[in-house]
Amino acid sequence: MPKTLNKGQQAAADGFFDFLFSGDKEMIISGPGGVGKSFLMGYLIDEIMPRYEKMCSLLNQPVKYRDVHMTATTNKAAEVLAQATGRPCGTVHSFLGLKVTDDFSTGVSKLSKTNNWKVHQRIILFVDESSMVDTTLLKYIREAMLECKVVFVGDHCQLAPVKETKPPVFTQGLPMYVLTEPMRNNGQPALMAICQQLRDTVETGTFNPVQVVPGVIDLL
C-alpha cells in the first residue's frame, strides 16, 4: 500500500525529486517535532529514490546518486532516527571521520579529522537535528561532500549551537521546505495550539499568556 503524505510532506517530496536533478548541493526540511520528518525521510528513500532512478532510465541518463546515508548530530538523535525508520544511522561526526573534543574552558566542542576522514563522492547524506550543526561542522560537511547531495533536516526555531546566534544551516539561503501539520498530537488540539504558540513566540518575540485547559494544560 503506498504511503500517504500530507500537503507539506508532498511539497517536500516533490522538491527532493527536483533537487536530485538540479545543480543545488543542499536543501532543508524544517519543522517542529511531531510533523512527520522521520516518516518523510523514509518516504524519500523508499519512494522518491526509485522514481529518480526510473526517470534517469527514461531520460537515458546515468544514475548519479545511489548510496544514501542517514546521520544525525547526536548519538541520541541517531538512535531515535534509526528506530523510527528501521535504517542504520550514526552521528554525522562518525560518518565523516571527525573527532569531537570538549573544551570545558570555553564550552565549545572542537572538531578534528581522524584517520577515518574521507571525501565522499556522489552520495546523498541526510543530517537530522541539523540546527545543532555549527559553523565548523558545516565547513567539514561541505569539504567532505564532492558531487554529493545533502539534506539538512531540523527545526529552524530551535536553539542555535553554542557561541552561534542562529543555526548556521538556516542562514545559507538554501531551498527549504517547512512542515507544519502536526501528526503526533493531532488528537489534542490544546497541545497543538500551545506548541504553535511557543513557536510563534520564538519567531516574533511576542509571548501571549498560556490558556489553561483542565486535564490537558494546567498551571502548577
Describe each region flagged by the PLM.
Residues P2-F21:
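N-terminal pre-P-loop "Q-motif" helix
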Residues V68-Q121:
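Inter-Walker segment of RecA-like/P-loop motor cores
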Residues D128-E129, G154-H156:
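Walker B catalytic acidic pair
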Residues I29:
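Hydrophobic anchor at the beta1->P-loop junction of P-loop NTPases
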Residues G33:
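The conserved Walker
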Residues K37:
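Conserved lysine of the Walker
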Residues L40, L44:
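Hydrophobic positions on the alpha1 helix immediately C-terminal to the Walker A/P-loop
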